[in-house]
């Protein structure tokens, strides 16, 4: 298993404070135009911005889903982060300290990308690069799409250094960038066949323990888990 100590120096894990940011509709529209210019140029497509804002924002979402982890300019990251962080603030941040808990454990239903936990856990695939299907509603897509292109770039660096696909039941960590959380912990759950096996259970248990151990290694105080492998990977939720 490729451990934190082996990749922590090839990505930036330093947390930087973010200031409150409110963008006008005109500012958002201008950022979308500039981002689309870059993304369309990469795709060798012609730029045309007569669309309403929501259509342009959805185009950005889909294009970023499909974009390979190639380098991007500092200017692109600057304007992307402004737009995405303003959207995070508009969506509202849920303070994990306000969620009722028992024995330091809480069950909460909602959008995990709104939680300000020290880390949120992403149910990833073994490429660890996020979902490439435009506008797909899986948690992997949603987390990458709202955090920003930096997450895919960081994961690509980790995977390049690791030299192989991510084993199921392990975990990796990146910054969360434009999410309210500080970090994202990425873990790959078991893909269940016709019935759940003991190996499936062992691997799923490993996802949770590996994530918790990584959080402990990073000295994090709160971690938010989504349900791992209960979607298209087929692990029955009632067995969790």
Task: Give, region by region, the residue ranges found by the protein language model.
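Macrodomain-like recognition of ADP-ribose-binding/processing modules
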Residues: 1-240
């Amino acid at each position: 298993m490729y451990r934190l100590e082996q990749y922590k120096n090839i990505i930036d894990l330093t947390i930087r404070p973010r200031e409150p940011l409110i963008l006008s509709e005109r500012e958002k529209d201008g950022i979308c135009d500039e981002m689309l210019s870059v993304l369309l140029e990469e795709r060798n497509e012609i730029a045309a911005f007569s669309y309403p804002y929501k259509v342009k924002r959805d185009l950005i979402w889909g294009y970023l889903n499909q974009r390979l982890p190639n380098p991007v300019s500092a200017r692109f990251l600057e304007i992307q982060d402004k737009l995405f962080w303003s959207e995070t603030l508009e969506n509202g941040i849920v303070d994990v300290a306000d969620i009722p808990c028992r024995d330091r454990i809480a069950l909460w239903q909602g959008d995990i990308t709104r939680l300000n936990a020290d880390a949120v856990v992403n149910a990833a695939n073994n490429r660890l690069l996020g979902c490439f299907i435009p506008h797909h509603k899986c948690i992997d897509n949603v987390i990458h799409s709202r955090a920003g292109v930096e997450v895919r770039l960081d994961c690509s660096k980790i995977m390049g250094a690791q030299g192989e696909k991510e084993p199921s039941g392990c975990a990796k960590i990146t910054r969360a960038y434009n999410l309210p959380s500080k970090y994202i912990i990425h873990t790959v759950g078991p893909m269940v066949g016709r019935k759940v096996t003991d190996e499936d259970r062992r691997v799923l248990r490993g996802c949770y323990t590996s994530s918790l151990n990584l959080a402990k290694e990073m000295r994090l105080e709160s971690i938010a888990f989504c349900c791992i492998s209960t979607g298209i990977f087929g692990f029955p939720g009632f067995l969790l």
